[in-house]
From Swiss-Prot:
It comes from Prosthecochloris aestuarii (strain DSM 271 / SK 413). GO terms for cellular component: cytosol. Residues 572-631 form the KH domain. The lineage of its organism: Bacteria, Pseudomonadati, Chlorobiota, Chlorobiia, Chlorobiales. Mg(2+) binds at residues 505, 511. Involved in mRNA degradation. Catalyzes the phosphorolysis of single-stranded polyribonucleotides processively in the 3'- to 5'-direction. This is Polyribonucleotide nucleotidyltransferase. Residues 641-715 form the S1 motif domain.
Amino acid sequence: MSMFIRKEIDLGSGKTLSIETGKMAKQADGSAIVRLNDTMVLATVVSSKTPPSPNQSFFPLQVEYREKYSAAGKFPGGFFKREGRPSEKEILSARLIDRALRPLFPDGYYQDTQIIISVISSDQINDADVLGGVAASAAIMVSDIPFQNSMSEVRVGRVNGEYIVNPNINELRDSDIDISIGGTENTICMLEGEMDEISEAEMLEAIRFGHEAIKKICALQNEIAAEVGKTARTFSAAKAPDNLRQSIAEICSNELKELAYMPLCKEERAEKTAEIYKNAKAQTLQRYQQEITPEVIAAEPEKALYLNEQIIGDAIHSIEKQVMREMILDDAKRLDGRRLDEVRPISIELGLIPRAHGSALFTRGETQALVTLTLGTKKDAQMIDTLTDDADKRFMLHYNFPPFSVGETGRVGGTSRREIGHGNLAERAIRKVAPAESAFPYTIRIVSDILESNGSSSMASVCGGALAAMDGGVPLRKPVSGIAMGLIKEGDRYAVLSDILGNEDHLGDMDFKVAGTADGITACQMDIKIDGLDYHILEQALEQALHGRLHILDKMNEAIQEPRTEIGKYAPKLTTIQIPVDAIGMVIGKGGETIRSITEETGAEINIEDDGTVTIASASGEGASAALETIKLLISKPEVGTVYSGKVRDIREDLGAFVEFLPKTDGLVHISEISNERVAKVSDHLKPGDKVKVKLVDVRKDPRTGKTRFALSIKALAEKSADNGASDKAEANR
């Protein structure tokens, strides 16, 4: 029978975080509820007890984070009125939790494991994502699932120089830091966030501050786990016996070492590595197949490992990893021959996509991003509806990673979680220097298509995104660049790597992406695979990243120093004016008739805000100007001598035609003012619904009714046209 336990901790600033277990979801292997004010998160974990396949070599961990609309007393949108597939926010939150938890499961634990985090209550000011990380860790800690250490996640903000743990959305609006930190009592294992160009020292200070809160929450989890008192289940990690690994090393370690010291391109290295793997497997199997017969395996089942191709492949991989790490630590030499702090060669080309509003091809080594800019109007903004925010998103960056970029075939279709995560990081990096809506009222969409990848494609998207925006005339406050840092650590020896390759990411201990301007950091993301990362290593990584960023910015400045003064040739031209609030109805017209008419005549798109801000968009400057003039006329007072576009409302055969020349304002075109020729019947010249240009020739008040009467003329315009024609003819005859 489950035991109910509830404990809480004071986070400061009047915030109390509580963890409870033993009340809900008791059939899961572990469950926990974390609460901060009225935001509550339920996390459950279930890990299969069926042994994994002997050939399995990965940990099938699935983390799902879902925000229930009922948690905030809301109805989901759509016809079915129920939650559907995960939103982008839910996917990003799930990744945040997954990345912090995954390194803490023991090596060789390959049981199918599923963690489901559900937001069951939301006060709509406290985001639940980092609470989900705490709840997930607590659920594992009270289960029998093997887990190395409790993990906690916090968000750190800074308002007026004061650091805050788990700032609410109101505090975040005034904060210059928004960073999520995941860690254990001993170390930091995950970072992700955005900042207003803060220094490396300030970044470290924020991490230290957050880690202190993490230690307290981890201690709380440990207390609860001790009271529950479950013993971790045992498991058998299938790995190569020592003498098998030694035999494999004798076969392939020298070849792998020789290959490591060859500065080859990615494709050549992959081909030669595959050949070494193939030969080493064949020689190993040949060596043991005669010795280990079915009878031997029946007597000693563990001997089957000597003939397991997956186990042999894993052993070769571990030798390859060891060779690369020793080369870096012993000789300060990398797979492609670079120094530890050296950035790969960079090339940049701008404006190569003729119809895009801005474009850049950014190539760094064997990583290449084709980035395009599209500018749109307010109606192109993305509508965001989450538990804590309802807003229009007017800056977005989308990242695409097709399989051909790594020389593979694969599924092409929906956006993967990885693509969403990488795009979000690049978006946050550039958004910090994007212009305010008041200065640049466009919706901005940047798309990064990765054409080649050998590490650090998200940071290539940052650089390419900033370049494409500047090429398209987006007035970024400053250019932004990004770099991915790596780490190799063995005991007290370590090496920090700048601009890591795919292999260095895969075989190394850290992936630390840092983006920013010349003046400070705007975004970061870090994943650590080891326990015990020292702060002095983080400090060195940040300092080395700064030098790398500045080097990349210099290369970007060679291509373009300032945003172009004009937007792209094919981008919509926007004009903004302010009209009185009481004139909004006049511009829109009955049932939208007036605004539709302007759109049809000018080809411009018109958007009107409740405060009277009118934004006019058109593919041509002429269309925007025509729409602007029409709107100005609509809201202006009638002036004698002004020409208006009107619509015939009614005709009187013996009197003339009544024309609506301004919304709800009619004037009379007397029968004598229709044409220079004699008009016998008005209907011979005009019909109700006809659109005509008229000139206001007189305004007077009716002495009997007191109403203002407007006298209009079509003839006056014809006379003016004739006069201009005669003048032109006379000029030509001179």
